[in-house]
């Protein structure tokens, strides 16, 4: 950094401090703000709480300041709610008032300033959801593609059985499951699949998506997002984000979207039964409902929101079953008893397997893939729990704490699927109880629930019925340390799993 830039930065900090103090005094008189740590000029609470705003750190703050508290992160107001009642207020009762998405310097790059579905501005949300519902999020889609999901899950089983290391020293099962998830979603999107983990296009796609996730999920860029005058220090980071974004969108366009357009020009896709998701999306584009960029950013959403989050949940489910052998045995016994030994789990079978469903619910409770949901924002001044919420505040719902608060749940730290068959038998993943919101609820809920639950059931069901899933030799358990990100909760270390095939003779 040269001397001139340093002088300009220090001057800007002094001016910003003066303005911040003045605004703070004026606003303090006008607003009744939620409690929280005392902020300092310019930096707010950033120096006190740091960049790492993961679900556990925010839970610790909730224990100090209450179910609603305010953090001043530089020039941004960050309001965190941590009770079912307040979650209902934000997501349902005042769903319109708090229905917008906050801006973020990195996500502005990766979503084209909200040209996707997840971060689209509230006014266009309903139209974008309508366009995406038909090709992705209906029971018709489940029935159309469930045979493909079952095929991909069985391919994992077959490949693991062929690998001699799987039943001895063990394998990193996640790698093969990642290919499965790409194939499941690329079948729906493009009617395409990858033959192996070594497929050059899959390798390239996986690497770019992985780099995108690393850049977007990191807390490293928060300081430049919260304090705009520090943004020059992010120049290299944001340049890398833009390069990754451009390369990904070009790859989506060249290898998938344009290829499907060419196919459509030579082969009729008017038959609804032959259409894949991109055909429906391109139809909407031709009608002028969305533009070329929207098409690519929708594809970008599915590559991250659908593939990664479901993969994280599958990986967490396997880890918990490996570490809780009695629970794994109960799942296996239920499948054998209800379906018969060797009868492979299918999508229609899932309704007959309540204990397997309880395992999935418990995985999503204890290891919620999006523990803070996706942030909300109020465009205008609003009221919440008797407090004033200034316009354009970032609202976080700590959904992980809602589902892990001992005041709300019996021994929440335990992995105990039985709770969903006993005292919590009424609780579903669709948001019927505001203590349990793995997919959110309301206007901004995740529509992918209709795909994620059956994919989780088929995958975990087939793995458990075909293998004994064990820790590697010399270990009694596998490491389940967490890694939290801006919007994610995944396992820190991708563990080696021993998969001993079962005999059905």
UniProtKB/Swiss-Prot annotation:
Q: Which residues of this UniProt protein bind (E)-cinnamate?
A: 212-217, 305
Q: What keywords tag this UniProt record?
A: Heme, Iron, Membrane, Metal-binding, Monooxygenase, Oxidoreductase, Transmembrane, Transmembrane helix
Question: What CDD domains has UniProt attached to this entry?
Answer: CYP73
What EC number(s) does its UniProt record assign? 1.14.14.91
Which reaction equations make up its catalytic activity? Answer: (E)-cinnamate + reduced [NADPH--hemoprotein reductase] + O2 = (E)-4-coumarate + oxidized [NADPH--hemoprotein reductase] + H2O + H(+)
Summarize the record's induction comment.
By elicitation.
Q: One GO CC term of this entry?
A: membrane
Asked whether the keyword Aminoacyl-tRNA synthetase is assigned, the reply is: no
Top EC group? oxidoreductase
Record's keyword annotation contains Transmembrane helix: yes
Lineage top rank: taxon: Eukaryota
Cellular localization per UniProt = Membrane
Q: Report how it sits in the membrane.
A: Single-pass membrane protein
Tell me which residues bind heme: 446
GO function term, MF aspect, one: heme binding
User: What family name appears in the similarity comment?
Assistant: Belongs to the cytochrome P450 family.
Briefly state the protein's biological role: Catalyzes the first oxidative step of the phenylpropanoid pathway in higher plants by transforming trans-cinnamate into p-coumarate. The compounds formed by this pathway are essential components for lignification, pollination, and defense against ultraviolet light, predators and pathogens.
Q: What is this protein called?
A: Trans-cinnamate 4-monooxygenase
Native source organism of the sequence = Cicer arietinum (Chickpea)
Taxonomic lineage of the native organism: Eukaryota, Viridiplantae, Streptophyta, Embryophyta, Tracheophyta
* Gene that produces this protein: CYP73A19
């Amino acid at each position: 950094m040269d001397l001139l830039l340093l002088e300009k930065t220090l001057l800007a900090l002094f001016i910003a401090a003066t303005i911040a103090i003045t605004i703070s005094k004026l606003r303090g008189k006008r607003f009744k703000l939620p409690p929280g740590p005392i902020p300092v000029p310019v930096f707010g609470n950033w120096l006190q709480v740091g960049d790492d705003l993961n679900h556990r750190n925010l839970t610790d703050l909730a224990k100090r300041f209450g179910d609603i508290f305010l953090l001043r992160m530089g020039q941004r107001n960050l309001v965190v709610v941590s009770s079912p009642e307040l979650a209902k207020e934000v997501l349902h009762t005042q769903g319109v008032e708090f229905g917008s998405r906050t801006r973020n310097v990195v996500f502005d790059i990766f979503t084209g300033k909200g040209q996707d579905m997840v971060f689209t501005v509230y006014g266009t949300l309903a139209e974008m959801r309508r366009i995406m519902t038909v090709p992705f999020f209906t029971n018709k889609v489940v029935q159309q593609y469930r045979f493909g999901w079952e095929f991909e899950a069985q391919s994992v089983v077959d490949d693991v059985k062929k690998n001699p290391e799987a039943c001895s020293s063990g394998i990193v099962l996640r790698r093969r499951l990642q290919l499965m998830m790409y194939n499941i979603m690329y079948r729906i999107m493009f009617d395409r699949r990858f033959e192996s983990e070594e497929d050059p296009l899959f390798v390239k796609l996986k690497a770019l998506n992985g780099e995108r996730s690393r850049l977007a999920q990191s807390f490293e860029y928060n300081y430049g997002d919260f304090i705009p005058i520090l943004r020059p220090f992010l120049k290299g980071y944001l340049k890398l984000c833009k390069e990754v974004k451009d390369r990904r969108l070009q790859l989506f366009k060249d290898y998938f979207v344009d290829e499907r357009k060419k196919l459509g020009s030579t082969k009729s896709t008017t038959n609804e039964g032959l259409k894949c998701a991109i055909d429906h999306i391109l139809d909407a584009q031709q009608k002028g409902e969305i533009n070329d960029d929207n098409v690519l950013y929708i594809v970008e959403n599915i590559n991250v929101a659908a593939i990664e989050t479901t993969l994280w949940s599958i990986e967490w489910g396997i880890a918990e079953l490996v570490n809780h052998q009695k629970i794994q045995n109960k799942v296996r016994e239920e499948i054998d008893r209800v379906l018969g030994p060797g009868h492979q789990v299918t999508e229609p079978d899932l309704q007959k397997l309540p204990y397997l469903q309880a395992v999935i619910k418990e995985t999503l409770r204890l290891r919620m893939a999006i523990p803070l949901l996706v942030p909300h924002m109020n465009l205008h001044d609003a009221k919440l729990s008797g407090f004033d919420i200034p316009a354009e505040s970032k609202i976080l719902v700590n959904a992980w704490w809602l589902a892990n608060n001992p005041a709300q749940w019996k021994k929440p730290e335990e992995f105990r699927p039985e709770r969903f068959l006993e005292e919590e038998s009424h609780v579903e993943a669709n948001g019927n109880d505001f203590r349990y919101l793995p997919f959110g609820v309301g206007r901004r809920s995740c529509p992918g629930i209709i795909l994620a639950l059956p994919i989780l059931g088929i995958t975990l069901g087939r793995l458990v019925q075909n293998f004994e899933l064990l820790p590697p030799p010399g270990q009694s358990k596998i490491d389940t340390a967490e890694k939290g990100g801006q919007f994610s909760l995944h396992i820190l270390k991708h563990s080696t799993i021993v998969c001993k095939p079962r005999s059905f003779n």
